[in-house]
Amino acid sequence: MFYPFYEVIAEVGLPALFHTGHSGIGSGLPGGGGIRLKYSNPMYVDDLAVDFPELTIVLAHPSFPWQDEALSVALHKQQVYIDLSGWSPRYFPQQLVRYAMLRDRVLFGSDYPLITPDRWLADFAEADFKDEVRPLILKENAARMLGL
């Protein structure tokens, strides 16, 4: 259904961003506000990454509760990135923090106004990321991905 749209995005070199995981939207509402969590599993993006290998894809948020699936897709598909928006770094699962093989494909994101950049950065400073990975996450990976 959206493949013509993805073709255009890939052709002009723009990244496609997909919200993955449980972000809290609809929590506590009757029926979860109609949000079907199964569609936020990052494994659904794997097919798109296969069909459009030239399309840069960003998995927004740490993909809770599917962090391992997100890490697997990003490790397997070189054009897939993970952004860290929507969650305070103090709550990141250890496998996300320690997954060194993806150090070049993890991106900063605050998801403002839900989390202010100042709060996110303060929590990031306390997280257990290696010092050499911090500038990659905060700037260098995004600059490279965007061709800046």
Explain the meaning of each model-derived region.
Residues 1-107:
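Catalytic pocket-lining loop regions of alpha/beta-barrel enzymes
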Residues 101-105, 115-148:
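Mid-to-C-terminal alpha-helical segments outside catalytic/metal-binding sites
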Residues 64, 113-114:
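Short glycine-enriched loops at secondary-structure junctions
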